[in-house]
């Protein structure tokens, strides 16, 4: 097999490719890399290298196909060589230290080959590594930041010096040492041997073979702690303190070197300071070491000319702000960087960061600022103003730094392009010119400052800078330009610069080059290069987008992105706009606008700030705390009772015992107070924050649709998107509870204090006299002093002074906290009722402007502690059957992900299509889900291509004649039959007009006409279907519901009996229920399964179906709700309103008997809406039976338990006609869509099939109730009556105003503070209904 073949086929090479160098028998073979296996790789061919989890492999070559050639050393020393896939391993720098740390950890035993799935990252080991690294970071000492380097993963043996000498730090491969052993490796293709050099003194190969292409002069930096130990031992032995000098490394970093110890460190080692010791006896390195400019090559890095070279050893590196090269391991990153996986820098887009007025956000602005500052610097030089020159240079310094940072952050744009070398070269020139501007500018201005009196103007500007140097005149001219020539060696400007120097010298006449000429040249040079760099990046940023996928470590992105042309990376540290979560602080009322930029991250936020749903379970827990707090307060108050003080505590010893007992009881109660505070602080207010509600005068002005945010007015300017009195009252009480707990602690401690005034606040300062003239008037000044005295006395009377009576003060606080906790309990009960009302109403009316995601957010916030690791739920691949030959096994089996029950959770498109047409098994449920949901995974063209490729499956190589015949009969023929059957099912039962694509259909038709397809009986049928589709005919038509052949019941209210202006009460409630049922069922049957998918999934569904049927159904249900409410509010007399309410309760109950849950829900939604439910005087006239019936129906449709009772009722409906409540289906579809990712592990190759299966199950439930229709007779007059009223009924907002006119809002009465809370809570629910966003 040729090299080209195996590269294109992506199979492991069987021999060294022609372009590779084949080592001879006697030639040592050097490794390229050292890696560790993360998975078991069994190896199915003789050329494969079998791997076990944790094996150390030395990579000898890397093929472009992704297969690497490596060697493994066994326990007995034997070597085995072969090919293995690169995605089964990770670099030793990444994995080895973690495995070493976890070698005795029981968690490692749980990592088995069962977790292996093709092209899926192994989650168990990854999570284990992450956990280990996070623990190591938390347990690291204060100076652990020194370890943020590659060498933190090196073992102690790597850099441990010998006992006899301190200068024993060895380089990775010492060219002067012959201590190497030759090991023979068996070749993978023949019996010849190759040699591999290994250092004999190393106990582990992995300690030596780290990094790519390590040179002979590379050094291994020592750990800081080890170096500090060596320094201390050296000081104790020789009574001298060594010194460290900084050296530059080949990758542009600073590394510290000690000549005495011959040790390198990436961080500066420190010694302990001993104040009693004498002055340190410092030992300095030699001058040759200090002056040596040779860069140091550090192990694990690659040679770089400057810090702008690629970080990962190739130009294809991705951005990571914490990495300098590819060998940086995970432990070198901070906890924040290990959490965020940003592949792009942030860009200075609008409304993302709080910006300073001086911040620069665009490339053009940067260019203009640079040009402007350079002009000012020239002017300052011309005006001989040293202060202005220094000021402008400081600004230029910031601009150059911003330019360098922007180029570095944006390097992914120019790497591997024709602009890469140009960009690097011009940036070097900018830095060089910047330095020369400062040097020549300062020298020029210094000459003017010190020599102005000694030289005339002619001599002044002809002054030679060489004369300032105390060197010979022959070298005087070379000194100012030496740095220029050194920096620009080999640059394109060399000739031009030399010509300019010659011109300048000739113009001066005396051969001198002055500072100002150099300065002007450098300014022009810097200006030119900055403009060129900006021009390059303007070209590079054209048509570039900022996408969320650049920041959430996924390769899936549905957003179109934001244009970033002419936008700089964010080079300034700034706060994010409207982000109030960070570190340990989370604000529950501000949701992040940029989920990928969330500082703390939603997962971290939920991990440390678990939220609790405000439900009856939370109420029960809160009630227990309140009971314990009240009991403790009563016990303390008994001990503080003034009546028993003289009887039982008549001496100091008894009073001390009493105080001790009070302290014990108080701190016991504080424990319950603390638990209660923690509980109420964890309440989740997602529902209240996500729904807008209006109070006060806002209702008078709101007459526009709340679907249009532009008409909301000034009432919505605040970021707080709720206005609930009950919520605000809850927060007021919560703060009051906090204050009381603090006061009780101080009051309790004051019982035993000798000086109770210790807790008294500092004396307030005298008020500021803004009018000094008035303060000079004696009477005015006396009045101010008198007011201060009276105010202080008043504070004493109010109990502000602890010294009056600590018992009385503590007793008052205990009484207050007992009342406050009971009030908090009452408010919590109202919060529960309000939350249920919001969710019930929002779900029942199925408002499009209601953000259903609020329920998802609430669920995610509260259930994080209960959720298992999603990654660990998936295991890979089908189990192979032992009695099936290998050539008859399923295809792409290991690309399927299964759950513990064997259901398919996901997989690649190819694997899913292979399972769809499997030759050994028929999974009908899987087929039905796939054919319904395939458009969300792939286009019709992709599906047909995969099916055709499946039909034309090729036999594997190496089959005998008998095996080939068996393969044809047992595998190929069944697969072909399955392919044709799948195509037939798609056209017959799962076709949507959204799929119509004429080129694809014609290609499909060509395939159907082929001889191979026509050999099957279904071939002609397939051709017929495709030709009909191309002619515009419909093949798939939903069946009409079956209506029984029996005679329908006669209408109880005939159209002829109704007057020209009928009233609703003229229609019999039974007949109205029938007519409503017919209307709802007709609209329900128009809803297709494809419309449901398009409604919830949107563009991701891959459908262009109309959702008008769903819109009309929701509109009709909401019109019925408005109709019922308005019919009640039209009556001014409360008793007549009661008659209408009783009538509609009967209608709703009859709808329930007809299984018309849609109309029933719409009616009870109207009766429980705020305009109707707030009419207390009206509800007082209702009889108990009607109220009980209404409560039962409301309980049936209660969403607090996910409609469990309603779902149970639906299960027992067989062949009877039914109109289900569509809002439940919408909620379920929305939860599945938003609560599950489209792809597993954020990889587009791994389709989340389980999400599609759940969606298909819900949609199938919708179609279930379309089969049987209602045998009722339609009354056109009643239908026209309903149509007329439905169109002109006012909205719920307008109805609320009518409700206020009928029964005005009650005002809370109560002047005292003790009653204000009670009055507020009893009337807290008298406000306007919410409008849904």
Swiss-Prot record:
One of its GO terms (molecular function) is guanyl-nucleotide exchange factor activity. Residues 133-166, 177-187, 194-206 have a biased composition (Polar residues). Pfam families: RasGEF (PF00617), RasGEF_N (PF00618), SH3_1 (PF00018). Residues 1068-1305 form the Ras-GEF domain. The keyword Cell cycle applies. Residues 900-1034 form the N-terminal Ras-GEF domain. GO terms for biological process: cAMP-mediated signaling; cell division; cellular response to glucose stimulus; cellular response to starvation; filamentous growth; filamentous growth of a population of unicellular organisms in response to biotic stimulus; filamentous growth of a population of unicellular organisms in response to starvation; Ras protein signal transduction. CDD domains: RasGEF (cd00155), REM (cd06224), SH3_Sdc25 (cd11883). Residues 17-27 have a biased composition (Basic and acidic residues). Gene3D superfamilies: Ras guanine-nucleotide exchange factors catalytic domain (1.10.840.10), SH3 Domains (2.30.30.40), Son of sevenless (SoS) protein Chain: S domain 1 (1.20.870.10). Residues 167-176, 474-485 have a biased composition (Low complexity). This is Cell division control protein 25. The lineage of its organism: Eukaryota, Fungi, Dikarya, Ascomycota, Saccharomycotina.
């Amino acid at each position: 097999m040729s090299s080209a073949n195996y590269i294109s086929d992506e199979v492991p090479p069987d021999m060294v490719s022609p372009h590779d160098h084949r080592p001879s028998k006697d030639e040592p073979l050097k490794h390229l890399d050292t890696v560790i296996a993360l998975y078991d790789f069994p190896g199915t061919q003789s050329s494969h290298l079998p791997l076990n989890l944790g094996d150390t492999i030395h990579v000898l070559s890397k093929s472009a196909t992704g297969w690497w050639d490596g060697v493994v050393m066994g326990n007995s020393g034997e070597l085995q060589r072969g090919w293995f896939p690169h995605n089964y391993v990770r670099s030793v720098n990444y994995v080895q230290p973690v495995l070493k740390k976890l070698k005795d950890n029981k968690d490692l035993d749980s990592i088995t080959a069962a977790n292996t799935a093709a092209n899926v990252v192994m989650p168990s080991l990854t999570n284990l590594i992450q956990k280990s690294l996070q623990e190591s970071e938390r347990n690291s000492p204060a100076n652990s930041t020194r370890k943020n380097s590659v060498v933190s993963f090196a073992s102690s043996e790597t850099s441990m010096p010998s006992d006899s000498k301190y200068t024993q730090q060895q380089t990775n491969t010492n060219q002067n040492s012959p201590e190497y052993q030759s090991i023979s490796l068996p070749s993978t293709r023949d019996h010849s041997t190759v040699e591999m050099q290994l250092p004999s003194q190393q106990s582990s190969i992995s300690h030596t073979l780290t990094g790519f292409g390590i040179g002979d002069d590379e050094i291994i930096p020592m750990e800081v702690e080890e170096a500090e130990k060596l320094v201390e031992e050296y000081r104790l032995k020789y009574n001298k303190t060594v010194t460290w000098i900084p050296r530059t490394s080949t990758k542009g970093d600073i590394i510290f070197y000690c000549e005495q110890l011959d040790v390198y460190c990436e961080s500066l080692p420190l010694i302990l300071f001993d104040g009693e010791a004498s002055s340190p006896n410092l030992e300095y390195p030699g001058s040759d070491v200090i002056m040596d400019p040779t860069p140091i090559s550090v192990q694990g890095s690659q040679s770089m000319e400057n810090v702008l070279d690629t970080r990962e050893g190739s130009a294809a590196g991705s951005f990571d702000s914490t990495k300098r090269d590819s060998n940086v391991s995970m432990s070198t990153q901070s906890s924040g960087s290990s959490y965020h996986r940003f592949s792009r820098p942030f860009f200075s887009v609008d409304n993302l960061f709080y910006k300073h007025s001086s911040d620069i956000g665009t490339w053009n602005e940067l260019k203009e600022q640079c040009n402007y500052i350079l002009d000012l610097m020239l002017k300052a030089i011309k005006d001989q103003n040293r202060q202005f020159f220094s000021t402008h240079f400081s600004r230029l310094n910031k601009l150059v730094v911003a330019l360098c940072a922007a180029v570095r952050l944006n390097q992914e744009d120019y790497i591997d392009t024709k602009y890469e070398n140009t960009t690097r070269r011009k940036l070097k020139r900018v830095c060089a010119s910047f330095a020369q501007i400062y040097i020549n500018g300062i020298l020029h201005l210094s000459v003017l400052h010190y020599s102005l009196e000694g030289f005339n103007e002619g001599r002044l500007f002809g002054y030679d800078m060489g004369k300032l140097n105390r060197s010979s005149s022959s070298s005087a001219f070379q000194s100012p330009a030496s740095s220029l020539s050194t920096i620009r060696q080999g640059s394109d400007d060399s000739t031009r610069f030399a010509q300019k120097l010659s011109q300048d010298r000739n113009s001066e006449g005396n051969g001198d080059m002055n500072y100002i000429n150099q300065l002007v040249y450098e300014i022009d040079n810097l200006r030119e290069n900055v403009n060129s760099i900006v021009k390059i990046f303007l070209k590079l940023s054209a048509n570039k987008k900022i996408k969320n996928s650049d920041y959430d470590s996924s390769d899936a992105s549905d957003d179109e992105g934001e244009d970033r042309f002419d936008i700089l990376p964010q080079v300034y540290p700034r706060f994010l706009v409207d982000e109030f979560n960070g570190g340990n602080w989370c604000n529950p009322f501000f949701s992040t606008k940029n989920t990928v930029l969330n500082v703390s991250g939603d997962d971290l936020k939920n991990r440390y700030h678990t939220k609790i749903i405000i439900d009856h379970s939370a109420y029960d827990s809160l009630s227990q705390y309140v009971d314990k707090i009240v009991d403790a307060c009563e016990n303390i108050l008994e001990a503080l009772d003034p009546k028993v003080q003289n009887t039982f505590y008549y001496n100091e010893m008894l009073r001390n015992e009493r105080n001790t007992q009070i302290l014990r009881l108080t701190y016991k109660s504080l424990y319950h107070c603390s638990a209660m505070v923690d509980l109420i602080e964890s309440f989740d207010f997602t529902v209240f924050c996500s729904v807008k509600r209006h109070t006060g005068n806002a209702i008078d002005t709101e007459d526009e649709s709340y679907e249009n945010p532009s008409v909301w007015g000034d009432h919505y300017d605040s970021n707080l998107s709720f206005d609930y009195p009950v919520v605000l009252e809850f927060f007021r009480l919560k703060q009051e509870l906090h204050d009381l707990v603090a006061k009780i602690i101080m009051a309790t401690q004051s019982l035993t204090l000798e000086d109770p005034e210790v807790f008294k606040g500092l004396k307030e300062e005298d008020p500021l006299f803004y009018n000094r003239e008035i303060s000079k008037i004696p009477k005015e000044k006396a009045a101010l002093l008198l007011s201060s005295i009276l105010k202080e006395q008043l504070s004493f009377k109010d109990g502000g002074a602890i010294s009056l009576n600590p018992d009385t003060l503590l007793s008052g606080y205990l009484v207050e906290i007992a009342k406050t906790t009971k009030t908090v309990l009452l408010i919590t009960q109202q919060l529960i009722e309000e939350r249920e009302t919001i969710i019930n109403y929002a779900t029942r009316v199925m408002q499009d402007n209601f953000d259903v995601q609020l329920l998802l957010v609430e669920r995610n916030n509260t259930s994080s502690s209960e959720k298992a690791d999603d990654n660990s739920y998936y295991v890979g691949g089908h189990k192979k059957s032992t009695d099936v030959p290998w050539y008859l096994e399923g295809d792409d089996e290991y690309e399927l992900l299964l759950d513990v029950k064997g259901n398919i959770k996901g997989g690649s498109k190819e694997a899913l299509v292979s399972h769809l047409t499997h030759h050994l098994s028929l999974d009908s449920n899987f087929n039905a889900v796939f054919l319904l949901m395939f458009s969300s995974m792939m286009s019709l063209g992709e599906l047909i291509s995969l099916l055709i490729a499946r039909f034309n499956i090729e036999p594997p190589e190496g089959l005998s004649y008998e095996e080939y015949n068996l393969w044809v009969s047992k595998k190929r023929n069944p697969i072909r039959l399955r392919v044709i059957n799948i195509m037939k099912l798609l056209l017959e039962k799962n076709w949507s007009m959204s799929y119509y694509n004429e080129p694809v259909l014609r290609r499909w038709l060509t395939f159907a006409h082929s001889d191979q397809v026509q050999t099957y009986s279904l071939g002609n049928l397939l051709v017929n279907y495709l030709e009909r589709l191309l002619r515009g005919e419909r093949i798939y038509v939903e069946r009409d519901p079956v209506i029984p052949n029996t005679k329908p019941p006669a209408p109880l209210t005939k159209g002829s009996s109704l007057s020209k202006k009928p009233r609703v009460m003229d229609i019999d409630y039974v007949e109205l229920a029938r007519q409503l049922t017919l209307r709802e069922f007709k609209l329900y049957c128009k809803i297709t399964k494809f419309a449901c998918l398009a409604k919830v999934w949107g563009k991701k569904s891959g459908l262009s179906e109309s959702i008008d049927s769903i819109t009309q159904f929701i509109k009709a249900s909401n019109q019925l709700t408005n109709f019922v409410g308005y019919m009640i509010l039209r009556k001014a007399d409360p008793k007549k309103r009661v008659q209408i309410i009783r009538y509609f309760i009967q209608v709703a109950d009859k709808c329930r008997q007809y299984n018309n849950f849609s109309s029933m829900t719409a009616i009870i939604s109207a009766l429980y809406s705020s305009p109707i439910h707030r009419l207390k005087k009206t509800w007082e006239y209702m009889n108990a039976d009607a109220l009980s019936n209404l409560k039962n129906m409301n309980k049936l449709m209660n969403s607090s338990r996910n409609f469990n009772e309603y779902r149970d009722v639906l299960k027992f409906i067989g062949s009877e006609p039914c109109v289900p409540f569509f809002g439940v289906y919408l909620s379920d579809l929305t939860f599945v869509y938003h609560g599950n990712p489209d792809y597993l592990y954020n990889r587009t190759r791994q389709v989340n099939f389980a999400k599609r299966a759940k969606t298909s199950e819900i949609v199938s439930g919708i179609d279930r109730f379309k089969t049987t229709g209602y045998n009722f007779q339609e009354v056109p007059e009643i239908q026209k009556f309903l149509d007329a009223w439905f169109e002109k009924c006012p909205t719920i907002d307008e109805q609320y105003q009518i409700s206020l006119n009928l029964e005005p809002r009650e005002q809370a009465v109560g002047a005292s503070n003790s009653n204000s809370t009670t009055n507020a809570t009893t009337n807290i629910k008298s406000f306007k209904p919410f409008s849904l966003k």
